């Protein structure tokens, strides 16, 4: 069960990733975690990646694909894996296919931009404890104040509307070609491609994912 997860920031991808991992007993492969682990383990590819990152440069697709191949060959990936946030571009998707890393299912969680802006723009955080509130979905007892300390709540820079919209623009720009790419792969019968409505309840989305993957 080799799954690739697509979804904009704030679409609820992390929650479904956790669910898929537990349900199918497969690990999540995130390129950031993988890079850090390879650097820490001091593997030849990890050392190469460290050299590039220490120089303040971007790690090449070739190197990332090498790390992914190394990672999926590990024992815990015997039943499959969940790729999150990779590939991001068509060259990466091509390199993955050329490297023999096949995908069985593409799962896209779709939430309209305005809904994401509402979700993320409504988040408030208590800087001291990291407690998170939401002006619509999880309101503090007193508006703008932390329930425990009564201190002021803040908006994280990442949650400001302009930042959220910019991240969404980048996501759509990067992902639209990938959606078409994997749509074509699915049309050839080499994988399944399913799009889920992420505005539904978490449980409903999970239920639909299981139905589509079984």
From Swiss-Prot:
Q: Which residues bind AMP?
A: 31, 36, 57-59, 85-88, 92, 156, 167
In residue numbers, the region (LID) covers: 122-159
UniProt-annotated binding residues for ATP: 10-15, 123, 132-133, 200
Specify the superkingdom.
Answer: Bacteria
Task: Please name the Gene3D superfamilies in this protein's record.
Answer: P-loop containing nucleotide triphosphate hydrolases
| Endpoints of the signal sequence | none
What CDD domains does its record include? ADK
Name the chemical reaction catalysed here.
AMP + ATP = 2 ADP
Keyword Chloroplast among UniProt keywords: no
Notes concerning its domains: Consists of three domains, a large central CORE domain and two small peripheral domains, NMPbind and LID, which undergo movements during catalysis. The LID domain closes over the site of phosphoryl transfer upon ATP binding. Assembling and dissambling the active center during each catalytic cycle provides an effective means to prevent ATP hydrolysis.
User: What's the family?
Assistant: Belongs to the adenylate kinase family.
Function, as annotated, reads: Catalyzes the reversible transfer of the terminal phosphate group between ATP and AMP. Plays an important role in cellular energy homeostasis and in adenine nucleotide metabolism.
- Protein's name according to its UniProt entry: Adenylate kinase
Q: Which organism is it from?
A: Shewanella piezotolerans (strain WP3 / JCM 13877)
């Amino acid at each position: 069960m080799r799954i690739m997860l697509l979804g904009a920031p704030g679409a609820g991808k992390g929650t479904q990733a956790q669910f898929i991992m537990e349900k199918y007993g497969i690990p999540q492969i995130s390129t950031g975690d993988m890079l850090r682990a390879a650097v820490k383990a001091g593997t030849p590819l990890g050392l190469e990646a460290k050299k590039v990152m220490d120089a303040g440069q971007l790690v090449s697709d070739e190197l990332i694909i090498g790390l992914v191949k190394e990672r999926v060959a590990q024992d815990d990936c015997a039943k499959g894996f969940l790729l999150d946030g990779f590939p991001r571009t068509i060259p990466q998707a091509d390199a993955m296919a050329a490297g023999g890393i096949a995908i069985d299912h593409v799962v896209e969680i779709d939430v309209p931009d305005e809904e994401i802006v509402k979700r993320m723009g409504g988040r408030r955080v208590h800087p001291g404890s990291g407690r998170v509130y939401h002006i619509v979905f999880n309101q503090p007892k007193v508006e703008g104040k932390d329930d425990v300390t009564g201190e002021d709540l803040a908006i994280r820079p990442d949650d400001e509307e302009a930042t959220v919209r910019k991240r969404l623009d980048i996501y759509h720009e990067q992902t639209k070609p990938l959606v078409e790419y994997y749509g074509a792969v699915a049309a050839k019968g080499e994988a399944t491609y399913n799009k889920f409505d992420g505005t539904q309840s978490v449980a409903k989305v999970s239920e639909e994912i299981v139905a589509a993957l079984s």
